[in-house]
């Protein structure tokens, strides 16, 4: 796992499939909207980065559609086949 500082927030890069993580692209798209989420998933389609927030299953805000445990289903159902993607975990201990 790689620890990162992105726009003043600490994250760990816990998954980087097909080298999908691009710090410059993520920094430009990661807004305050994503701060409450425990995980940020980024996937690439048509040379565009898409971000989606997910919660840990123990988080009170967790629903079926944003539970990190459903990541594989999200990738299969909502992302381009064989796409590049990554998962960032918010570091709450900083």
Report residues per predicted region:
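N-terminal leader/targeting segments and the first structural element of proteins
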Residues: 1-45
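Compositionally biased, intrinsically disordered or flexible polar/acidic segments
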Residues: 8-17, 59-62, 85, 91-92
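Acidic, Ser/Thr- and Gly-enriched intrinsically disordered low-complexity segments
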Residues: 29-30, 34, 39, 59, ...
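Beta-strand-rich binding-surface signature
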Residues: 38, 48, 85
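Short, structured protein-protein interaction patches enriched in aromatics and acidic/basic residues
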Residues: 43-57
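Helix-rich interaction surfaces within compact, conserved domain-sized segments
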Residues: 63-94
